[in-house]
Amino acid sequence: MPALPWLDENLWFPHPDSALKDPNGLLCVGGDLHPARLRLAYENGIFPWFSEDQPILWWSPDPRCIIRHEDLHISRSMRRFLRNSGLTYSFDQHFTLVVQACAAPRSYSNETWITRDMLQAYSDLHQIGVAHSIEVWRESELVGGLYGLAIGRCFFGESMFSKETNASKAAFITLVRQLHAWGYRLIDCQVPNPHLLSLGACQISRKEFLSILEIEVRADFSHPWKMTIDPTGY
């Protein structure tokens, strides 16, 4: 593996075009998780992803997985579920609980990349109005949700969780619809998986992704994080 740039206390990143092809998108190492550095990273198509026993690793894969509202696919069975499930939704009511639930062991793995330092970093971003969560409720129980960053007219999804069937899908679909209603242009999904692709996510080149960010993350854009759509309206 070629030597990677090591970040110091100065606030900078290498250009994403210098990222490795294998492993896809690995760009640089080190630095910190200060809110200013994290925001700069996302604005430039870069995100941190590392395990507890690793230094901070920064990534910008090519291609990039995104979803736009016009590509959102909701199956008939999912529409019925959303109409009749009895689930309710909120924004930013329990951000820390959502991140902790995303970090919990899954049925297929006990590993997590959401370390204690990552939890603190994204909680700091939440406190300054950059990171947000959507919560899915079954009465008073938190059964699903996801979190990410909102910068300009782009939302950068980080992780989702589900404690009952379809709860994470419901969170994702509701978020995509609400972001569209607010005027967002796209959601960054980072890397593809079957779950996201089944909902309409697609892959675009890193070059195209960066050209979109260059315009959209600089948009002067703010709004209250309050539900304005009917999440059961299908």
Curated annotation (Swiss-Prot):
It is found in: Cytoplasm. It catalyses: N-terminal L-lysyl-[protein] + L-leucyl-tRNA(Leu) = N-terminal L-leucyl-L-lysyl-[protein] + tRNA(Leu) + H(+); N-terminal L-arginyl-[protein] + L-leucyl-tRNA(Leu) = N-terminal L-leucyl-L-arginyl-[protein] + tRNA(Leu) + H(+); L-phenylalanyl-tRNA(Phe) + an N-terminal L-alpha-aminoacyl-[protein] = an N-terminal L-phenylalanyl-L-alpha-aminoacyl-[protein] + tRNA(Phe). It comes from the Bacteria. Keywords: Acyltransferase, Cytoplasm, Transferase. One of its GO terms (cellular component) is cytoplasm. One of its GO terms (biological process) is protein catabolic process. Its EC number is 2.3.2.6. It holds the Pfam family Leu_Phe_trans. It is an enzyme of class 2 (transferase). The keyword Zinc does not apply. One of its GO terms (molecular function) is leucyl-tRNA--protein transferase activity. Disulfide bonds: none annotated. NCBIfam families: aat. Functions in the N-end rule pathway of protein degradation where it conjugates Leu, Phe and, less efficiently, Met from aminoacyl-tRNAs to the N-termini of proteins containing an N-terminal arginine or lysine. Belongs to the L/F-transferase family. This is Leucyl/phenylalanyl-tRNA--protein transferase. The gene is aat.
